Regions:
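Active-site nucleotide-sugar/metal-binding loop of Leloir-type enzymes
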Residues: 54-65
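Acidic donor-binding/catalytic loop of UDP-sugar-dependent glycosyltransferases
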Residues: 73-86
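Conserved catalytic core of nucleotide-sugar-dependent glycosyltransferases
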Residues: 83-165
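C-terminal catalytic/acceptor-binding lobe
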Residues: 165-166, 170-231
């Protein structure tokens, strides 16, 4: 069964994605035109990712491999479907970047909580001011098993999560923050293996620019959950 990319976007349609991100967005990813993979974007989305993702877990065949990806991610690796298939033979959930040995403390960003030498994976980014003409690679470290995966790309077989009774926690107050860290730690608690695989993808985002009220509320929620021993 071919993988299914699922993404949420505030844009109204593909034209808006083109205008906002140029060519670097999820619907321009490799393997879509040749039918090796499918993609669905929930446009005009204002709901929390945790709510949408949980709905999707029960909306498709249990054998389906879901790829939950940000709308500003372009998968340009022509062999990503094959690499994903191999990666899911080794790990229960795969991603592009993450880390191990996290020290849970504020600020709760995975690449800060994990020591530099314990980061894994690689992701390309668009050079700011280049109008999309240039990209560069952020090489976090060698590929391998991780404790936490970045939410820009999370892939798994639906039945793996359902069998382990893993869901996205909808008590998370954020629209699009902390769901990935919480999900990753929940997977680990349920004995699922997470790891990064070498898929060439571009994330057309500069990352978190400031700690918004939404983000700070999510951090407080996450830290309390950690203090309460939920992981």
């Amino acid at each position: 069964m071919k993988p299914l990319i699922l993404s949420c976007s505030q844009a109204s349609n593909k034209n808006e994605l083109d205008n906002k991100y140029g060519k670097y967005h999820i619907l321009n990813s490799a393997s879509l035109k040749d039918g090796k993979a499918d993609a669905i974007v929930k446009f005009k989305n204002t709901a929390k990712l945790t709510e949408i993702y949980n709905t999707w877990l029960t909306s498709f065949d249990k054998e389906t491999v879901l790829v939950l990806a940000h709308d500003d991610v372009l998968i340009r690796d022509e062999q990503w479907v094959e690499k994903l298939e191999q990666g899911l033979k080794k790990y229960d959930v795969v991603g592009l970047a993450g880390g191990i040995n996290a020290k849970i403390t504020a600020p709760c960003l995975w690449h800060i909580m994990c020591p530099r030498e314990d980061l894994r994976g690689r992701v390309s980014h668009v050079v700011e001011g280049s109008n999309g003409s240039e990209t560069y690679v952020t090489d976090f470290g060698k590929q391998g098993r991780v404790l936490i995966l970045d939410g820009l790309f999370l892939a798994f077989k639906i039945k793996t999560l359902l069998s382990a009774e893993v869901w996205f926690d909808q008590t998370n107050p954020c629209v699009a923050h902390f769901y990935d860290i919480d999900f990753s730690l929940t997977c680990n608690k349920k004995q699922l293996k997470l790891g990064t695989i070498p898929i060439d993808a571009v994330h057309n985002s500069p990352g978190l620019k400031k700690y918004t009220d939404d983000w700070l509320a999510g951090q407080a929620w996450f830290l309390q959950k950690f203090i309460d021993g939920k992981y």
